[in-house]
Amino acid sequence: FDVFVMPVTGGNPLRLTYHSSADIPQDFTPDNQSVLFLSARGAGNKNIRFYSPRLFQNLYQVSVNGGRPVLMTEAGMSAARINASGDQIIFQDKKGYEDHYRKHHTSSVTRDIWTLDLKTKQYIKISTFSGEDLEPVFEPGNTGFYYLTESSGSLNIILNRNGQEQRVTNYHTHPVRNLSVSKNNTLCYTYNGDLFIQPANDQAAAVLVLVQNDGRNNSEKNLSVSSGITQFVLSPNGKEIAFINRGEVFVTAVEGTQTK
């Protein structure tokens, strides 16, 4: 995998990374001039760990215009986000190979939430639940952070402000996943196959998704040719029929379902 950027309205994507290791985008910097991404590429001679690229990934930063990536931290992590001030990273750790989508388990590899002060390089573990704590995102204004936890039995959203926690969702049947937050404090997440948005102190609502095409390939759509035939002719042996549909010539068997 490599990192690309493109306008939300569609258009040509710009490739930012070219390394043979998988590069996974995480966040934009507050000034929108750089992208944070995780990669298992070598971090330099100070890192003496010999690890699998599937497990520990380092956090890098690269300009949205391209260029050489810059290493930010060698700590193995995932789901990394940067705050509005650009001086703190919040992330979930990655202790082992346990499936990210496994539910209702407690073990030595369940994920926890950490913060990294980019000025002091200090790491602080925030979560204490023995099960899964996942996908942290900063609340706008640096007042707190949201994250997913299974402490209620199923993954739900919690708001943490200075150690005081407030439950935001209360689902029981299925887990909440893919959490993000906008600058106006509107949450976005998936639940039971649908995409939801939830403004602060309001109810969640499912939304319709329209995906923009990047314009590199023609759009494809499966169409039936059993109707709309304009001309046809029977073959001399009576076994095939040639016909025209939407300006294209097709041949179909009289007995059978094969059409070319």
Predicted regions and their residues:
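A flexible loop/linker signature enriched in serine peptidases of the S9 family
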Residues: 1-4, 17-24, 33-60, 64, ...
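Conserved beta-strand position repeated across blades of beta-propeller domains
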Residues: 27, 81-83, 137, 179-180, ...
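Residue-level detector of Asp-centered blade-edge/turn motifs that repeat once per structural unit
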Residues: 30-31, 84-85, 140-141, 182-184, ...
